[in-house]
Design a protein with these regions (language model features):
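Aromatic- and glycine-rich peptidoglycan recognition patches
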Residues: 181-214
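Hydrophobic/aromatic-rich core segments of domains that either
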Residues: 68, 123-189
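Secondary-structure boundary elements
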Residues: 45-119, 151-152, 163, 201-214
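N-terminal targeting leaders characterized by basic, low-complexity, disordered sequences
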Residues: 1-12
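N-terminal Sec-pathway targeting helices
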Residues: 10-28
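Membrane-interface motif at the C-terminal end of an N-terminal transmembrane signal
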Residues: 31-46
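Solvent-exposed, well-ordered amphipathic alpha-helical segments
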Residues: 13, 29-31, 84-85, 132-137, ...
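Intrinsically disordered, low-complexity segments enriched in Ser/Pro/Gly/Ala and basic residues
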Residues: 6-8, 23, 46, 191
């Protein structure tokens, strides 16, 4: 029997079938991936964040960025005695600001706050942290937030002293008393509906445990 010789057309036909098979596999794979995407969508990491959390953290990161700006610190330093320590700054601020609950005319820029001469816990804490940073001390802003809506409940500061962060509440005129908020009637418990965050150097850190009973 004479063997059948393979012609060019036969080889082309086989190659065509191979390419068709490859393309078919790719199309089927693409269809399966598309179906998988819609049935099992890739989880966006940000979806783990509760609604309002990013806006809350972004806001106070922005406040700290302005506080830490070279221009802000230079303007504030010009109003301070370079020999002031944190205790002096605490007393200096009390002489400059009056606690007023009226919500009109609030500022979050330290120099504007000082010009207005008034504020609540937010303004007192911003000015205090700004003054500390202006004189080269380590200080950060601390915010207690209602996690049901991510609005602030109270704001204070922490100073870095002897290797640890020390509680400072400029508007309440107290130092190193982190347990005091446990008895405050916020209508919500610290650690469950109330979370506490510290803001510094473009970052934030949850510090709820420092101020809770647990």
């Amino acid at each position: 029997m004479t063997p059948v010789k393979k012609t060019h057309s036969t080889r082309r036909h086989r190659q065509t079938r191979k390419w068709i098979a490859v393309v078919s596999i790719l199309l089927v794979t693409a269809m399966l991936l598309t179906l998988a995407y819609f049935w099992y969508p890739v989880k966006n990491p940000s979806s783990d964040e509760p609604p309002g959390f990013k806006a809350f953290t972004d806001h106070y990161l922005g406040v700290m960025k302005n506080i830490d700006a070279s221009k802000t610190k230079a303007e504030l330093a010009s109003q301070l005695n370079s020999k002031y320590n944190q205790t002096d700054l605490f007393a200096w601020e009390q002489s400059k600001l009056t606690f007023v609950q009226d919500p009109t005319g609030w500022f979050e820029d330290p120099n504007q706050i000082l010009n207005s001469g008034r504020g609540i816990c937010v303004q007192f804490s911003i000015v205090y942290v700004s003054a500390c940073l202006a004189l080269g001390y380590q200080s950060r802003l601390v915010v207690a937030a209602d996690t049901t809506n991510w609005n602030f409940i109270h704001v204070w500061a922490e100073d870095y002293y002897n290797g640890t962060w020390v509680h400072v509440d400029p508007s309440d005129k107290v130092w190193n008393s982190p347990s005091r908020y446990q008895s405050w009637d916020w209508g919500k418990a610290i650690g469950s509906e109330v979370k506490i965050y510290a803001f510094q150097d473009g970052k934030f850190q949850e510090v709820t445990k420092t101020y809770s009973r647990n």
